């Protein structure tokens, strides 16, 4: 039988349009066949009128090939097997853009580059069979550069009223309807004519943020498909271009998840700040900027300012590791008792535990002048005493007692009020 070229349906043109975005995300897609597994979920979210755009492209292609339009697109399977994938994608004259979507040829271009970090919170995630997967309730975005730090920010609550979410909430005047919010966001990230800048969010939030953007855009007369990329790819791209080395995604994620600024001032919106609520869409965006500044400032010789990180917290926690995991608590306690040279680390660790984020002090703040030889939780010492020989039982009665919030200053421990 003579060879026959595979027909192109609506799904083929949808996948072809998605290939540049998939490449920017670092996915190995050299042709349409490679991209099909990554596009099925986005295709399922499209409405019939949105799919009609790609169906029209398929009809025009068949007409140009001199073929009959044949049965309608609705009668064809969504994913048609491609017999000759190598013939389906036209050759590109230019190489695909790098991960960051920016030209990182020089340090100056990178330092002056503008980045937008975005996050959208939802009331929850609905089951897969529901047409509306998320209920957007809050949006935050910051304009950032390595040189200037956070240059501007945008924040708004999305009115969860009867017209959108069917969730009536009274006495909450800070919310706006979805059309107003998305139009204000457009004006924030694109105040002047020209190319729209790429927007970045964390990879774990990308599916939710991308869906909410498209959903909110349907309520507005202004339709703009924003280019949503991941912060992890941006950081990897910066390191790769600057140092010719690519850090692991796991390391980058840990870089963006530090907790030292969770309770810092001027990191949340006014409402969350006044009500002392940790979770805030604007705080997520500012935290991304803070983490990137803290990681790259010394590498590029940038002088940190309050626009880069909360300085009052950065200076106090400069020598304290924000996170610490002890895998073997028993061995750790024993090491602290037997090793005289371990006292410095012991004191530092005790200070870090005393500054667990409780609202009184930001996480990671180091309080100097507090020394303690307490060996940990009482249950640990109890188990040690049980396992010791009977001749040493009398030592248990002379052990120090664990620190508690009710220990008075006369026992050698300073209260929180005396440390401030």
From Swiss-Prot:
GO terms for cellular component: cytoplasm; nucleus; P granule; piP-body. It is found in: Cytoplasm; Nucleus. Pfam families: HMG_box_2, Maelstrom. InterPro entries: HMG_box_dom, HMG_box_dom_sf, Maelstrom, Protein_maelstrom. GO terms for molecular function: sequence-specific DNA binding. Interacts with SMARCB1, SIN3B and DDX4. Interacts with piRNA-associated proteins TDRD1, PIWIL1 and PIWIL2. Interacts with TEX19. This is Protein maelstrom homolog. The gene is MAEL.
